[in-house]
């Protein structure tokens, strides 16, 4: 595929950061629509890591870095969780000396290296016209870097925290909410059996959506989120009141 004149535009897809159940369906949806519109689709392995490890030689084996996606390939994977392209937390603008690919070690030998020039060369070598990174703030922040360098990027937010500003929906968030609700419902039996006040902490980084929405759905009595200060004394009073009002004596 490399360096050949092409009649089709090429889309590259990668997944970075943590895994969520909706990644494979997202990859499938993009791939099938793109193929039917006449595009060629390349899936990069292990997020941005696949893009920095490409060897720019026509006879090089780059199968560990990317694969050509087909309808058959994505149809086999889309019913499973996670990402069949694999993922990593690699950020090409912050690559440690030990993580620099072997073929680039003679060129990059600082403690922290910016491999963006190599990424751009690799994209050109592979004939990628558009890149679709799927990930959270760190993955997408590097997508912004490539956009600033003049490359065409379409970012898809993926984070259970729902903390990517300016977006309507984050892949993984809805699953986080339903799983949190299920777990909270299961823990209620233990809280009720022992007549306890149960405190549950959920993931969410610096955003309170993962705690607030399950509470609004009725699975918890009270909720505290990082966006607002709270009084531990007042919270304690409310939880004691909730417990006393509950016939099973828990909150």
Positions of predicted regions on the chain:
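Short glycine/serine/threonine-rich phosphate/pyrophosphate-binding segments
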Residues: 20-30, 51-52, 93, 114-117, ...
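Short, acidic/small-residue loops that bind anionic groups at enzyme active sites
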Residues: 38, 44-45, 147-170, 224-231
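Short glycine-rich or small-residue beta-strand-to-loop segments that form or flank ligand, phosphate
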Residues: 10-18, 84-86, 129-133, 198-201
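N-terminal phosphate-binding or glycine-rich loops at protein starts, especially the Walker A/P-loop
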Residues: 2-58
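A glycine- and small-aliphatic-rich helix-loop capping segment at beta-alpha/alpha-beta transitions
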Residues: 28-37, 58-68, 145-155, 171-175, ...
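Glycine-rich nucleotide/cofactor/substrate-binding loop typically near the N-terminus or early
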Residues: 34, 39-125
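Accessory alpha-helical/coil subdomains and C-terminal extensions
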Residues: 122, 130-135, 143-145, 152, ...
């Amino acid at each position: 595929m490399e360096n050949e004149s092409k009649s089709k535009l090429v889309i590259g897809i990668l997944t970075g950061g943590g895994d969520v159940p909706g990644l494979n369906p997202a990859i499938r949806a993009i791939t099938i629509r793109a193929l039917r519109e006449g595009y060629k689709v390349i899936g990069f392995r292990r997020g941005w890591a696949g893009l920095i490890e490409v060897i720019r030689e026509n006879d090089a084996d780059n199968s560990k870095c990317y694969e050509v996606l087909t309808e058959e390939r994505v149809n086999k994977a889309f019913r499973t969780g996670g990402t069949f392209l694999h993922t990593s937390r690699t950020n090409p603008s912050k690559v440690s000396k030990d993580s620099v690919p072997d073929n680039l070690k003679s060129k990059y030998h600082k403690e922290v290296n910016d491999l963006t020039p190599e990424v751009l060369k690799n994209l050109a070598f592979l004939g990628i016209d558009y890149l679709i990174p799927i990930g959270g703030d760190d993955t997408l922040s590097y997508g912004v870097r490539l956009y600033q360098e003049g490359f065409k990027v379409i970012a898809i937010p993926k984070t259970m925290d729902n903390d990517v500003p300016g977006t309507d929906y984050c892949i993984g968030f809805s699953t986080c909410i339903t799983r949190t609700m299920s777990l909270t419902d299961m823990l209620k039996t233990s809280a009720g059996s022992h007549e306890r006040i149960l405190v549950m902490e959920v993931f969410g980084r610096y955003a309170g959506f993962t705690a607030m929405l399950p509470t609004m759905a009725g699975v918890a009595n009270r909720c505290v989120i990082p966006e607002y200060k709270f009084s531990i004394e007042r919270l304690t009073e409310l939880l004691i009141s909730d417990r006393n009002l509950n016939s099973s004596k828990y909150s």
